[in-house]
Design a protein with these regions (language model features):
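Short Gly/Thr/Asp-enriched flexible loops that form oxyanion-binding sites at enzyme active sites
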Residues: 42, 61-71
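Short, glycine-/small-residue-rich phosphate/pyrophosphate-handling segment
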Residues: 26-27, 76, 85-128
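Short glycine-rich anion-binding loops that position phosphate/pyrophosphate groups of nucleotides
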Residues: 55-58, 81-83
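Short beta->alpha junction loops
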Residues: 24-34
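Short acidic/histidine-rich motifs immediately flanking catalytic phosphotransfer sites
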Residues: 43-50
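Glycine-rich phosphate/diphosphate-binding loop of Rossmann-like nucleotide-binding domains
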Residues: 1-21
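Short acidic active-site motifs
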Residues: 35-39
Length: 128
């Protein structure tokens, strides 16, 4: 479901793609919801957008959801696997309604697609 690339390899692809769009990216990974919430709250105002793979927190991460709402920036929810083509419960994301959209099922390419989209959303905000 998730492919064979390591997180480091995926991050490398994301960095390469973002640099072509003249975007600066920051990576943060944690398996603990509180750490993710703290990171988002500690960095309010430092980011123009958030791309997040909430993993299992997709289904029950209410503190994460609240932190994303309060961040007040464009958010894209990303999943390596197609959560809509797996068990029914996997498609019930509580994050989806606070994100501008969701990209799922394209492996590491889900992240580069999200970079393209968030770049456009940021540019749209700056031009208004």
């Amino acid at each position: 479901h998730y492919g064979t690339m390591t997180l480091e390899q995926i991050n490398e692809r994301i960095s390469e793609h973002a640099s072509k769009l003249e975007l600066e990216v920051t990576f943060y990974q944690s398996n603990h919801e509180g750490n993710l919430v703290d990171h988002i709250q500690e960095n309010w105002g430092n980011y123009e957008g958030i791309i997040i793979n909430p993993g299992a927190l997709t289904y029950y991460g209410y503190s994460l959801k609240d932190a994303l709402i309060d961040a007040n920036v464009p958010i894209i929810e990303v999943h390596l696997s197609n959560i809509h083509g797996r068990e029914d419960w996997r498609s019930n994301s509580i994050i989806a309604d606070v994100a501008q959209g969701q990209i799922a099922g394209f492996g590491w390419r889900s992240y580069t697609a999200a970079i393209d989209i968030i770049s456009g959303l940021i540019n749209d905000q700056e031009s208004h």
